[in-house]
Amino acid sequence: MCGIFGFYLSRKLIDSDIKYGEKALKELNHRGPDDSGFWFDKEKGIFLGHNRLSIIDTSKKNSQPMKYNDTIISYNGEIYNYLDIKRKFKNDFANFETNGDTEVLLKLWNLKGINSFDELDGMFAFAVFQKHSLFLSVDFFGEKPLFYSISKDGIYFSSEANPLINLLNLKLINDLKNNLEFSVFGYINSPNTGYENLYKVEPSTYIKASIKNSKICISKEKYWKPNERIFEKGKIRPFSSKDIKSIKEILIDSISTRMISDVPLGLFLSSGIDSSLIACLIKKELNRNIEAFTVKFDKNLVHDESEI
């Protein structure tokens, strides 16, 4: 988990803008205590900030924001197939200075732009500034959060809502639809958040911000949609041994790609089937030992996961 924050304004940055950016990064320090950095261009009106939690390639070379040619990135998440991407485009990429996924994502975007999503398998939220456009995006299912707010002079974004609420003095709104969603689901569906002029980037979506005639121009596009056949009602039949084998292979592949790390890994182990199955496959199929953590609440037996 890292934290990103930034803004792209239709005017030149002034010193107070930079101070606001630094202050917001401090509010996100808990998301990335290993390193903090920012990059800005006063003339272009762009500020990108990043708080880092080091997982892959913990060296300083992997610090962010990271720049390559005319492309700068501030990124939170993990690209599980970054090694495959690195091999696939080895003839297109210049020599790598790091062993992490950030540089792979950065160079992939520099090469393919919005077509980069076709290559990605992972959880991510990132901001990319290229030439005179800012791109904000999150992963296919919105696992990594990214909030944004549009003002008269530009667009602001953050991994968490609080820096934007505090900086822009955003107010709660009393909306029936939002209230119902929160009561039923425990959250409000994106892009809404319950605050005025505060939005959450939707899954499989990218936002492009550009400056035209001294005004900020915003567009939003879906980069992926699930196959319509997923929602069709299929014929019910018993599970076959082939089905079970296929699911097992998919699970093992999915788990193994998520265990690439240069720091110790841990597993939240509940009394449920899913985490127990993951722990079992890690040990028996991948032959890896992993520390497991189970949560117990003394006064809340409903959420007591200690009985495994």
Describe each model-derived feature in a short phrase.
Residues 1-308:
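Cysteine-centered catalytic environments shared across enzyme families
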